[in-house]
Curated annotation (Swiss-Prot):
The protein's required cofactors: Mg(2+); Mn(2+)
Binding residue positions for Mn(2+) 1: D426, H430, H485
Regulation of this protein's activity per its record: Activity is not affected by 2,3-bisphosphoglycerate.
Keyword annotations from UniProtKB, A to Z: Glycolysis, Isomerase, Magnesium, Manganese, Metal-binding
UniProt similarity note: Belongs to the BPG-independent phosphoglycerate mutase family.
Pathway: Carbohydrate degradation; glycolysis; pyruvate from D-glyceraldehyde 3-phosphate: step 3/5
Expression (tissue specificity): Expressed ubiquitously. High expression levels in the nerve ring region, intestine and body wall muscles.
The protein's name: 2,3-bisphosphoglycerate-independent phosphoglycerate mutase
pH dependence: Optimum pH is 7.5-8.5.
Protein's organism: Caenorhabditis elegans
Keyword Isomerase part of the UniProt annotation: yes
Length: 539
């Protein structure tokens, strides 16, 4: 009841906003974009709910004017080979550019040796060189890849050495959650080898488990353990020759990487002191907020430490840990200016976005570039998802309801751009129930068919794509359920007879090319921020 009422309010209020646009007649062609969730292209019939379903509409659309486009890995800003997902898919579709995830941006900087020219890193090194000559690196040292990566730390050490900072101290946070509990000693050995032999630069200053250094639940008594180790040397003392053995003894006492109590090296020199510079190198923000705020802001007071807080510290983060933090970051948030929704508003072209509850955020927040903002002339419609325990029990979900709302808009002709998401192939695909996924695909095809007929009747060009694969692989090789996304390409279809698809010159087309293609069909200019390309040309 509440969701339905919310949808009604959205329609009433935002419908008026949509009607306020004045330049809708400027478009060459009106476009209806459908994003199917979890519809990949695979010719393998085994466990393929899409191929084995009765889908005459999509069969027709994918036998005429269509293309297969990439929706996974580096093509959408994810690590190479990683399957796509709904959030990233809609970000790329709506942004008209590849939206690189932080780990990928950093990996590319490492690969291309860009750290030495990174503006914030250069700034941190200049501060250290022009001050007391001391710089600290602190973060999680492992190859877990969830919060940080050891390769990023190694690249930072090399760059800082090249940038000429006299003294570098490393504060090693043990993992044991995203890696095996006793694997830290191996990362410690790699680190010592790297500092002592590979670069001959930098000193290991402290070792402490992430349980203490990376708390995120306001357990400041935990943060205080790492804080006092870093500023005051509170912990068990050791040196480079003995620290590995200290950790092994901790393992023997059932103290694993995550829970390592502080081990202190370098004496007073390795402590965070007045006027020092600190770089935290975790790229995931949530577990860096407390320790960085304790060092660089007045949150050290929450630690209730009796030690004097060092004065004039300057903190930098690998990424932006919180918008209101005063720290510079090596990789600040990328600008998503002039995504498709914003650009249409700039062009005075109104638009309509529709989805059922499960995917409503994807056609609003994610499609709009990760912004909550609703642009001028943008109308939104929420269709309630069915209230069932699992969606295999109602595999059609609310596809018919979404189609109803889209057809209403096509008949009204108010908005030159309308788009929607169909959730069933993905949401039912995740249940692993093959027969239900077949029904989900068939229900989606019926809904698309109804919309297709309405676009033909009311003068809209229909485009159909997907955000990632899923329902085309419902069975694992051993016959068990496959419930994850896939790396298969997805379709992009176009019903307009005046355009044909062409491949970009230097790469395979991807989700980032959808928005530029929409603009080309509508006869609108493409903003400079969109680095995707239109993959159609006029016939």
């Amino acid at each position: 009841m509440f969701v339905a009422l919310g949808a009604q309010i959205y329609r009433q209020y935002f419908g008026r906003r949509g009607m306020a646009m004045a330049n809708n007649s400027s478009v060459a062609n009106k476009v209806c974009l459908i994003v199917i969730d979890g519809w990949g292209v695979s010719e393998d019939p085994y466990g393929n709910a899409i191929l084995n379903a009765q889908t005459p509409v999509m069969d027709k659309l994918c036998s005429g004017n269509w293309a297969q486009i990439e929706a996974h890995g580096l093509h959408v800003g994810l690590p190479e080979g990683l399957m796509g997902n709904s959030e990233v898919g809609h970000l790329n579709i709506g942004a008209g550019r590849v939206i690189y995830q932080d780990i990928v941006r950093i990996n590319l900087a490492v690969k291309n040796n860009k750290f030495v020219t990174n503006e914030s890193l250069v700034d941190a090194c200049d501060r250290a060189k022009n001050g007391n000559g001391r710089l600290h690196l602190a973060g999680l040292v492992s190859d877990g890849g969830v919060h940080s990566h050891i390769d990023h730390m190694f690249a930072l050490v090399k760059a800082i050495k090249e940038l000429g900072v006299p003294e570098l101290y490393l504060h090693f946070y043990g993992d044991g959650r995203d890696t095996s509990p006793n694997s830290g000693v191996g990362f410690l050995e790699q680190t010592l080898e790297f500092l002592e032999k590979t670069t001959g630069y930098g000193k290991l200053a402290t070792v402490v488990g992430r349980y203490y250094a990376m708390d995120r639940d306001n357990r400041w008594e935990r943060i205080n353990v790492a804080y006092e180790a870093m500023i005051g040397g509170v912990g068990e003392t050791s040196d480079e020759a003995g620290v590995v053995e200290v950790v092994r003894k901790r393992y023997a006492a059932d103290e694993t990487d995550e829970f390592l109590k502080p081990i202190i090296l370098q004496g007073e020199k390795g402590r965070v002191q007045n006027d020092d510079t600190i770089i935290f190198f975790d790229y995931r923000a949530d577990r860096m907020r407390e320790i960085s705020a304790a060092m660089g802001m007045d949150r050290y007071k929450d630690c209730n430490s009796k030690l004097a807080h060092p004065s004039n510290l300057q903190v930098y983060g690998m990424t932006q840990y919180k918008a209101e933090f005063p720290f510079k970051s090596l990789f600040p948030p990328a600008s998503n200016k002039n995504v498709l929704a914003e650009w249409l508003a700039e062009q005075k072209v109104s638009q309509f976005h529709c989805a059922e509850t499960e995917k409503y955020a994807h056609v609003t927040f994610f499609f709009n570039g990760g912004l909550e903002k609703q642009f001028e002339g943008e109308e939104r419609c929420l269709v309630p998802s069915p209230k069932v325990a699992t969606y295999d029990l109602q595999p059609e979900m609310s596809a018919a309801g979404v189609a109803d709302k889209m057809i209403e808009q096509l008949e009204a002709g108010t908005h030159p751009f309308i788009m929607c998401n169909f959730a069933p192939p993905d949401m039912v695909g995740h249940t692993g129930v093959y027969e239900a996924a077949v029904k989900a695909c068939e229900a989606t095809d019926i809904a698309i068919g109804r919309i297709y007929e309405a676009t033909q009747k009311h003068g809209y060009s229909l485009m159909v794509t997907a955000d990632h694969g899923n329902a085309e692989k419902m069975k694992a090789p051993d016959g068990g359920k496959h419930t994850a996304h896939t790396c298969y390409r997805v379709p992009l279809t176009l019903s307009h007879p005046g355009f044909k698809f062409v491949d970009p010159a230097d790469r395979h087309p991807a989700l980032c090319d959808v928005a530029p293609t929409v603009l080309a069909i509508m006869g609108l200019p493409q903003p400079a921020e969109m680095t995707g390309v239109s993959i159609v040309q006029k016939i």
